[in-house]
């Protein structure tokens, strides 16, 4: 049986069962554990499956992003840990971008005492928080308003970002995998691509609960990021997959 045939069978089994063990796959195709692992790694690189401990599962699909209010209550400890680690990378006097989201809001909460900082954001909550609690210079992108996430999206926001020179961009996502970050909202893609082009350094900040999920629009491949910051809940298989792509991964320890 050639690799293409094996991988098709794997996809069919995963589609039927949701999650399949490596033992099941080796028995079904009468091949070695190592052969199956190579097939699974190839499929994961394509974004077709997600490796889990001892097996493989289909990637979860994000049909829509939760509202800001809902996201605030999710993975709070992990986001705080990521925010603290990300903030430690910021230098006084720099110009940074904080993408819309509750993980990036956690970064802002650790930056309120930093001197001579300029923060660019498309997020109204982040801008409002920094306005009340810091002395930093705040630049808001403006643009079409996304009510659910209290942020600006679309071409107007993207055009504004292209006019800036950003030292560090901290970019968030509702879903990520070895293929990259994705979103169910097309109007968010142009903003993320614009800030990636405008920034000297790009940092993905995303908690491990979102890993292995996919949405309709691929916003940025992981190769666009200089660093990825996540929490210690990331599966070992995911860490190995990211290491194979020679990606810089920083793990924030949950306190």
Regions found by a protein language model. Give the residues of each.
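N-terminal active-site wall of soluble small-molecule enzyme domains
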Residues: 104-106
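Conserved phosphate- and dinucleotide-binding cores of soluble alpha/beta proteins
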Residues: 2-14, 18-24, 30, 44-45, ...
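HTH-adjacent hinge/linker in prokaryotic transcriptional regulators
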Residues: 2-30, 34-97, 108-116, 120, ...
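Glycine-rich beta-strand-to-loop/alpha-helix junction loops that act as flexible
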Residues: 99-101
């Amino acid at each position: 049986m050639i690799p293409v045939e094996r991988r098709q069978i794997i996809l069919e089994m995963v589609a039927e069962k949701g999650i399949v063990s490596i033992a099941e796959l080796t028995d079904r195709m009468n091949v070695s554990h190592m052969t199956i692992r190579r097939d699974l790694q190839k499929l994961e690189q394509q974004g077709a499956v997600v490796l889990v401990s001892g097996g493989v599962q289909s990637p979860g699909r994000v049909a829509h992003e939760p509202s800001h209010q809902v996201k605030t209550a999710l993975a709070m400890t992990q986001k705080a840990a990521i925010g603290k680690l990300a903030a430690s990378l910021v230098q006084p006097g720099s110009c940074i971008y904080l993408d819309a989201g509750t993980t990036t809001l956690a970064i802002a909460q650790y930056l309120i005492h930093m001197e001579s900082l300029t923060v660019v954001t498309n997020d109204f909550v982040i801008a409002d928080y920094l306005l009340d609690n810091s002395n930093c210079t705040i630049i808001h992108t403006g643009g079409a308003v996304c009510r659910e996430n209290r942020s600006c999206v679309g071409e107007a926001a993207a055009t504004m970002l292209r006019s800036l020179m950003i030292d560090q961009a901290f970019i968030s996502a509702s879903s990520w995998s070895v293929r990259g970050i994705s979103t169910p909202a097309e109007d968010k893609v142009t903003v993320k691509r614009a800030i990636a082009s405008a920034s000297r350094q790009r940092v993905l900040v995303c908690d491990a609960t979102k890993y292995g999920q996919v949405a309709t629009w691929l916003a940025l491949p992981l190769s666009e990021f200089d660093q990825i910051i996540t929490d210690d809940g990331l599966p070992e298989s995911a860490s190995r997959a990211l290491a194979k792509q020679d990606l810089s991964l920083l793990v924030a320890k949950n306190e």
